């Protein structure tokens, strides 16, 4: 028993020292840091004073009284004085926590109005009222209880506790009035702070998403429109004189005859950024877009990679008519078929120019764009790209690259992967293909068709190709880039309806300018995000900081103070509990728990407020400079 008493005394002494030092550091931080000397922190200053007094008189005196077998040996006056100070400080702590909760609540709910109202003088008056009410209440009830009741002092000489505890109804009424009512008010305010903080956070997230969407829409990307059906083929006249042209430089190549093998790997897929308009493009009567021809050659080129794919051109055209207009901005890749294979090393004629590889580029709608377009039955069909090259087995036939718009994204992705493998093989054999001359003929066609299959989600190619206008070659041939501007239903020569792409030419300089504008818009968006972050720190962070402060302070307050008031209420109604050692032990523990809140509060400030944390850390390191 003696060892336990010594250990308890040492622990309580340590707890008292920690309480005094911690709260003195909080008070000192007000003197050292002007940023802490704000009206909202006056309540924390008041709470630190009450905790300091508990560390000076509450913990050591009650420990001595408990170790002396709950016998008071210092007289009645000191007993009443100690009880008065102890209860006044404890109730002042309760009301101070209530003041902190109310202050944080109005700081979040009505920030502008409350900040104008919350002047230093008014906050000081509130703190004075917080201390004045407990002082009057407990001074009168403790010192004057015998006088008001007419019974005089009813305690023995060795007893020391408040006399109104002997009246269970008065005792319970006082506890309900100044603790339980206050506790429920604080919980209600805490719930209001939580809802306000959550609402501000949700509003901030919605603004951020809208900002991201606007930033995405500002980028120069592909916009695909679907117009109403009923348009005929005369809606797009064969006139491209007013269209600006976007050329991709490609070195010459020739066509040679090869044996047909299994399907190889098509060329890679590149991503192309363009904003499209409803300009016109030359169409043939068979809905073919005529590309610039290449010079004829005696040899013919038959690539098995494209021959097998060309057999798939027999797919039926879609007869579905769009019924609404949808605009979508997304990044669409370009398909650039480049024939390359190990067996093509002799495909060039020595009289031809070197590096001629006509690249056919057609942006297509990616999977994300397709998924966003699905809104009606007539719009649920999306497009992907299938490439084939029609090969003539005649002596002077020319290779005709064909692009078919289909709706099977999985097959298109597989073809795109094969394109990448052919691209790698072509790079390996590039030195062997350094021949002079131009290819004979080579009319480029684009045939548009739709299958009845629905698109399936797939990953889009992540590769990009940036064309630089600086690398010019006299032998280079400029091949125009085809940019999709509108998808509409037209009537074919057979009377059926097919979907046709109205295309236009865009110049490379315009694309370069758009790239620069894109970078500029990204920088502007970053600046806007930075300003958004600053605004967020002034509004949403205020609510989050208030919620964090109240969570630590109010949470520790409820956990540590509630047990005492529960047992104290029972103590007034239970006569047998007073003589029960186990109940008295629980009562003593609950009393100590109330004291335990005082050394924890400084750490709660540090965890809830970064400015307090910085200043307290500086104080404990021995830095007492005033800033």
UniProtKB/Swiss-Prot annotation:
This is Muscarinic acetylcholine receptor gar-2. The muscarinic acetylcholine receptor mediates various cellular responses, including inhibition of adenylate cyclase, breakdown of phosphoinositides and modulation of potassium channels through the action of G proteins. Primary transducing effect is Pi turnover. Regulates the activity of ventral cord motor neurons. Couples to the G(o)-alpha G-protein subunit goa-1 to negatively regulate cholinergic receptor activity in the presence of high levels of the neurotransmitter acetylcholine in ventral cord motor neurons. Residues 222-266, 423-442, 449-475 are annotated as: Disordered. Expressed in putative sensory neurons, many cells of the ventral cord and in the HSN motor neurons. Expressed in some cholinergic motor neurons and GABAergic motor neurons, which are the two major types of ventral cord motor neurons. One of its GO terms (cellular component) is plasma membrane. It comes from Caenorhabditis elegans. It comes from the Eukaryota. GO terms for molecular function: G protein-coupled acetylcholine receptor activity.
């Amino acid at each position: 028993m003696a060892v336990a008493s010594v250990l308890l005394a040492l622990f309580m002494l340590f707890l008292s020292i920690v309480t005094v030092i911690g709260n003195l550091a909080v008070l000192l931080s007000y003197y050292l840091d002007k940023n802490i000397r704000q009206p909202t922190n006056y309540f924390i200053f008041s709470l630190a004073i009450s905790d300091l007094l508990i560390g000076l008189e509450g913990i050591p005196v009650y420990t001595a009284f408990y170790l002396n077998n709950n016998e008071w040996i210092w007289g009645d006056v000191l007993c009443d004085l100690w009880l008065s100070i102890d209860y006044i400080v404890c109730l002042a702590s309760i009301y101070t926590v209530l003041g902190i909760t109310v202050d944080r609540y109005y700081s979040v709910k009505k920030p502008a109005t409350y900040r104008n109202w919350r002047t230093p003088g008014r906050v000081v008056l509130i703190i004075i009222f917080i201390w004045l009410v407990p002082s009057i209440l407990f001074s009168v009830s403790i010192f004057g209880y015998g006088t008001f009741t007419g019974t005089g002092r009813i305690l023995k000489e060795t007893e020391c506790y408040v006399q109104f505890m002997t009246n269970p109804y008065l005792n319970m009424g006082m506890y309900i009035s100044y603790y339980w009512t206050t506790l429920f008010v604080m919980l209600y305010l805490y719930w209001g702070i939580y809802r306000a903080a959550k609402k501000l956070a949700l509003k901030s997230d919605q603004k951020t998403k809208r900002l991201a969407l606007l930033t995405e829409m500002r980028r120069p990307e592909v916009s695909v429109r679907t117009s109403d059906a009923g348009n005929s083929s005369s809606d797009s006249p064969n006139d491209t004189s007013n269209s600006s042209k976007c050329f991709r430089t490609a070195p010459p190549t020739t066509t040679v005859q090869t044996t047909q093998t299994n399907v190889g790997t098509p060329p890679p897929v590149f991503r192309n950024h363009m904003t499209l308009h409803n300009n016109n493009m030359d169409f043939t009567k068979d809905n073919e877009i005529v590309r610039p021809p290449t010079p004829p050659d005696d040899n013919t080129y038959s690539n098995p990679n494209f021959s097998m794919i060309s057999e798939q051109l027999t797919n039926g055209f879609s007869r579905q008519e769009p019924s609404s207009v949808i605009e979508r901005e997304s990044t669409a890749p370009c398909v650039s078929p480049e024939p390359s294979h190990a067996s093509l090393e002799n495909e060039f004629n020595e009289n031809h120019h070197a590096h001629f590889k006509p690249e056919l580029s057609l942006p297509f709608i990616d999977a994300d764009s397709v998924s966003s377009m699905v809104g009606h039955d007539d719009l649920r069909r999306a497009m992907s790209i299938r490439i084939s090259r029609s090969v003539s087995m005649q002596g002077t036939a020319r290779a005709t690259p064909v692009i078919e718009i289909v709706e099977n994204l999985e097959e298109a992705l597989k073809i795109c992967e094969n394109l990448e493998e052919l691209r790698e093989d072509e790079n390996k054999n590039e030195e062997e293909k350094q021949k002079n001359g131009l290819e004979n003929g080579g009319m480029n066609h684009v045939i548009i068709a739709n299958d009845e299959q629905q698109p399936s989600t797939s990953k889009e190619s992540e590769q990009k190709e940036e064309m630089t206008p600086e690398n010019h070659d006299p032998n280079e041939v400029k091949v125009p880039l085809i940019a999709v501007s509108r998808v509409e239903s037209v009537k074919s020569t057979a009377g059926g309806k097919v979907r046709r792409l109205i295309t236009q030419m865009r110049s490379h300089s315009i694309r370069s300018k758009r790239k620069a504008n894109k970078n500029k818009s990204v920088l502007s968006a970053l600046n806007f995000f930075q300003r958004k972050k600053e605004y967020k720190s002034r509004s949403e962070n205020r609510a989050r900081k208030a919620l964090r402060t109240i969570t630590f302070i109010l949470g520790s307050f409820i956990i540590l103070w509630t047990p005492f008031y529960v047992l104290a209420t029972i103590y007034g109604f239970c006569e047998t509990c007073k003589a029960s050692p186990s109940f008295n032990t629980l009562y003593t523990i609950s009393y100590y728990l109330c004291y335990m809140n005082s050394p924890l509060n400084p750490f709660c400030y540090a965890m809830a407020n970064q400015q307090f944390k910085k200043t307290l850390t500086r104080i404990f390191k021995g830095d007492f400079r005033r800033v």
